[in-house]
Amino acid sequence: MFAPIGAPGMGERASQNFRSASGFRDLLVHAVKVLVLSAYQRRPCTSMLRPREQKRIKMRLKWMCLMKFCFMQNNYWDTQRRFTGGMHNVPELATFDAWLQHWRVVHWRLNIISEILIDFQALVRMMKNLAGQCHFDFYPVCTHCVQLVNNWYIAEFKPHLEEETEWWKDLVKPRMGNPVHEIEPNRKSQYVESRRIPPPLNGDEFANFLHVCQCAKLAFDVERAATEENFEDALDTLEEDFYDIDSTIPKRDLLAADARVVKRAFTLRRKRRPNRTSVYSMKGQPPVTFSASDLVSCLGQVLSTLPTVKMDREAIEDQQDHLEDKQGGEILTTPQFIEVLRKKKREVREKEFDDSTQGKLLPAEDFTLSKHDVFLANSVLDGLRKSKLIQRFAGKCATSTKITVDLTNKEEVVRYGPKELASEGFRQTFNVLNRPEYNALNKLAEAGWKEAKSVVLNLHIRSYLPQQMNAYAFCVIMWGHSSDAQEAALSGSYVYLGDGEATMLQLPLLCEYVGHNLQDFEAYKRSLVLSTVFPEFSGIADGKAMFGITSIEFTEYLPTSHAGITHERDSWDAMLRNHTEEKRRFLAGFNVVDTIEKGNRKGFSFPDFDLKAVPRHQAVVRTFEDQDVAPILSKAKSMRVKTFGSFRAGNIPVNFLGTPSNGQVASKHSVSENAGYSVGDMKSAENFVFTQLITVPAASTKGNVLAGVDILANARTTMSGFYMRWLQKGYIDTNLKLICHLPRAPFAGMSFFVLIDGTGYLAKDAPTSLNEEEILSYPLHLVTTSDVSSYEFVLDWHRYIGQVPFAEENAFLRPTLFLVACVSSTLALSAKVEFYLEAQSVGEELPRTLAPSPVLSYPFQNSFLEDLDLFLPPKRLTLGERETTIIPLSFAKSKKSGDAVLYSHAAARLAHFQGIGGVLHGVVYLVGSQLVASQSRISMWSKEQHIQHQAVNVHVDTDTGVAFDLPIKDAFYASSVYGDSGAVIQVTCLCSPMSPNAIKAPFDMIFKIRGFTPDAPMCRTINFTQRFGWFAVEPTTSTGAIKLKIWPVSNHLESEDMKVTGYTNAFLQMCQTSTMHFGSVIIHFSWTLFGGTTNAATAGGVVTIAEGFGPEEENFRGHCRNLSIYEGRATVPLELGTFAGPTPLKKLDFKYRNWIRFTTPKGRNISSIFCAIEVLPGFSFYGRTGSPRLSVVGTTVPPTADASTSNSQGGDEDIGDQYSAALGRGRGRGSRPGPSPIRG
């Protein structure tokens, strides 16, 4: 026990100890005991020490006491429970960094305490009596006092200070620009005022006891620290960092205290004392003890905590600046390096990441780095490294590690490559990623570091393109010392440049010998290169700055080859298995780890391309003003990079992604890499589905069906592995890639359409020929021997059907392909041609549901015009004649074939508009033999132009297939889509078609309209876009009872004694040209009476509108209304669909469906019945197909069960024959005999 206050001999004993050799240590112990006693009895400690003792001790103890004062609360609660049994009004202790800033404000401005801490007037008077010195043992440590003082300081000296908050998290997706309405931020300050009651100065025994425990623990810490080496020097240095000489005013900003300075005073070797020492006890209570391990834990919190206050955005952005100061590097322990990685991720930790471009990203709370992610887990070895026992007893350990963090690139700019270096529609550029400087590397080599391993490369991209621009790039980190792109490619990712920025954390794991790097430092500087592949962008000039990069490289230096604590990339699959269940941080991609990218819901199709290696023995192109550019060596081997859709579940080894495209640098002992051979995709064997032999005659006529390919039947016959998997799952779970195994034959002139019939509407008749209008109304893919890239295409189920087909039964889907000759042969082949059509499974696994998004949904928008894929009829130019071809923009008009009317999906979309303005995007294909050539100019104007006027207009000159973008230019600024007036596409022959003497074939070409970039003010819709006329019925005076039944499909009505008129409108055209449709509508009936022959006084009658489900005899009814015949109108809602949701365009014999029945017993009194359909928002369309053959509207057709004048009450009319979705009457294919049954 300590002596009571005022005990005799207290001061004399302290003076004697002060003069002895160990006096200072004893004096420290004595002074702390005095502080504890004075705190417990609430008496000033100055009355218990002499002035010279106070002066000697004051500066030595001040900061040491402050450092550990507030980290003792961890053990206070145990003490509380033992002595008091629990108390509810326990004051909340402040953290060390908050209390440290608080104490400095009080120490600086003691006179403001009386104004702020009103409840602590006695404490203020006591502190003022101490000659202006703020004594920590009297000052409360609760958060209440800390908050009061900090609020005063901020309001007095930092009025501009604003705490950074996460108010932007209230926005669901803050990527689409500023919100229209102002959003009140949900701000929550970091300084939250405590609601707990502050401890009173007197009367609360537990508060007094808690304060004593704090001082007692502090006394024990001071006694231990005083025995360490350099204790006095550390305190002197620490004191000079914060105060001027003979001054109590802090030199630094009070709210910018940095505990790293305080940390230097405690980076001393500490001796562990495992024994427990009793420092204080209360009367009648067990003694309070503190173990050495508790104190070490307390010091660990001090050393690992770096208190900072976030003031503004600039302060947050400055967190990266300290990385540049580490260019030379410093020796970091493993936990410290992990902390560096964590700090780098704090900027993006709370951001919202949805789906990566080709892989699913992690939620923010899972997106963290741990020791097991980057380093080998070895707790014993890590403990020895942290305690430095390895170096102390064995000198420099063979497994020691030095880690540096280098800001290698901060001003690098990636530019759009020159046109001269473009290849197959792509432009590849190279940018060197800087490495550590020569002097820094030389010092490391002199210090004994042998190897340098590049562990992590953090690449940040800042786009210079407009927001939401549909622009993508492929960035890959390459090893600069290999001419084989297969070996040089380390890691890479697709990047969407329309969202402003992107970050990629990659693991190159490139290890190099430091001595060799010094010998050939120029080669070392080019060891890591960023290669960027851009697709061709129209309108972007060569050398345009596309984005800037900043790269941060984490390098591990090793003294021996045995050293290293990072994960070795022995097996990507093993690393994936080790991290999948815990954090799933290894994602799908091109050896990409943690790809971070915003706004990845933008859909895009990045085609395959050849990736070139870094050129050898020449400077990497970094600017585009230099004229002397050395050519790329012909012996460089490129790699074919393919799409990554099928690899969403995991990482992709490099050798699965592509193969060399040429083999000039191949080993002569390797068969797979010999010159002249192409290495196949080794995963294609697993993706095989079926093959079918196709026979093409030597000469064919336009419209001839060369072959029909029933996809399910072929897969069922082949019984491949994928088909067995489809049977297990019950549906086709992937898209199909169709490959035509044709040779490169540009002079053969063979071309054909692949017609995609998802519902099997054409397949039921097994046609041998189709007319041109019917072919162009279906989705098509053009295959021509003049372009080998057309030999492959992907059959996307969601695009062409709207859902995945069932594996075994056709049901309402029978996906069938027809190979149809697009033009008549003008240059006959010497013999028939036989080739195989192969199907492979590609892409990610598809869900067994509808497509995630429909192809179109109401209300109609201008953006729906961007994706049309409309083929125009082939154009033929005669040899030796210079002709001009005019193509009007009347793409919404229907096409007639005999007595039938045909629509395409693109025409149905355009039918919603009167006219459009903007930019037209198209492609022209050469479908004939390249033995016949011509030069053409393509432009657009309101009428045919002279060649001189055409030259100054926007135009495209071409002699082969080319894509073009033409702005719509017309006197009305817009063009009619129905052909009344407007702009035209003009194709002028700059050179008439020419060929060798023996070749008399004409020049054939086909235009494809990809879509329009609409100019919103110039896209004028028709007057009605939500309400359309459906049909009209005109009874006669001989008509009896009228009974009309409306089914939940876009059907038509037929009658033998009533004239039925089906109206043409954009909505029904969309229903006809989509595989499925689904949504809610409102049916509007209106009718009129005969004006001349019907007497209104005696007419009478009632109209009944009933709703029901299934056969009528089961009386499963809904609402029923009886209306007077004089009311003239009625409205009833209806949902178009089936039990499965969407309504397909195929006959389904479903009895149990919703229906609406319109009946009246006196049909002769009604002159006409008009029915309109109002489409409600959300009505959706799925898939694309061609419309059925529709007869001319307004004629009378044979009777069916859809409309009847009989009084039959039977249920036969419920048999489902309404799924034809026809707009008129008169089925039949014209060229084929006999009427065609209802579709399906």
Curated annotation (Swiss-Prot):
Keyword Transport (UniProt): yes
Membrane-traversing stretches: none
Gene Ontology MF term list: structural molecule activity
Domain of life, source organism: Viruses
Disulfide bonds: none
Cellular component aspect of the GO annotation: host cell plasmodesma; viral capsid
Residue ranges the record marks as coiled coil: none
Annotated spans, Disordered: 1193-1240
Any single GO BP term: transport of virus in host, cell to cell
InterPro entries hit by this protein: Nepo_coat (IPR005054), Nepo_coat_C (IPR005305), Nepo_coat_N (IPR005306), Viral_coat (IPR029053)
Further comment found in the protein's record: Virions are comprised of 60 copies of the coat protein.
Protein family (similarity comment): Belongs to the nepoviruses RNA2 polyprotein family.
Listed name of the protein: RNA2 polyprotein
Organism: Cycas necrotic stunt virus (CNSV)
